[in-house]
């Protein structure tokens, strides 16, 4: 059985690239292009991994991460933060929000 990966990302080319590569490796991939829809879908069906953009149009990925990690249902789901924010201070903030890894 392949892992279910949920992507929350607002840039279509990035979604397409990530989804293409994960599909090719046999993962089941779902996604949303905004934070509020992402939260709703994640709560409906718990994924095995969340790829989360920091800068979303409606709610910060950092806020989403903090809120998910506070809930016992989601605390053990790995979250990888995807962002263009590459400063050390941003990485620390992302990891302190509960992200398991941080990719720029």
Label every model-predicted segment.
Residues 2, 46-48, 73-78:
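His-Asp phosphorelay/catalytic-motif detector in bacterial-type signaling
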């Amino acid at each position: 059985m392949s892992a279910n990966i949920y992507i929350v990302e607002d840039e279509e080319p990035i979604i397409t690239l990530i989804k293409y590569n994960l599909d090719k490796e046999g993962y089941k991939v779902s996604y949303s292009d905004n934070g509020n829809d992402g939260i709703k879908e994640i709560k409906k069906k718990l994924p095995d991994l969340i790829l989360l953009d920091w800068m979303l149009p409606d709610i910060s990925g950092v806020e989403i991460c903090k809120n998910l990690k506070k809930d016992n249902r989601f605390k053990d789901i790995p979250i990888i933060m995807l962002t263009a924010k590459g400063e050390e201070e941003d990485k620390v903030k992302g990891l302190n929000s509960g992200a398991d890894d941080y990719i720029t």
